[in-house]
Amino acid sequence: MCSEFYTKDEVMTVLNDHNVTHLYHANTVRTACSYLVHKGLFSRQEMEARGYPQTAQSSDRIDIKYGIYNDIFFDSCDIHKRAHNANQYGPVLFVFSNKVIYEACHIAITRKNPIYGRNSFQLNENEHYFTNIEDLR
């Protein structure tokens, strides 16, 4: 896991400066139903540990290998809408207030979607994450 690069307040300021009022998490119907039944948004690792039903992802093995299987990813926009197409993560979209970041124990912002180039996660964290708040502005 990467180190702490910025505070939650710094991230909130950047989100607000860019008019990002909501964060988005898309998933399959099966996984989304587990979130609803168990009243929470869980990482894939946590879902597995608790025995909650979820849809397998083609990236699971690589995510485990590179230590991101316990991470939860959000988008800063509605990818369904932006791409004018179905979201590759699934048809169910959860929309959260940007204030959800205050509930996170750790925040890291990736330079690009980790689904692309997952085999390169052996590179150093500076190549995968924004490492200072100024890079986000």
Residues covered by each model-derived region:
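Active-site-proximal loop/hinge segments that shape catalytic or ion-binding/gating pockets
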Residues: M1-R137
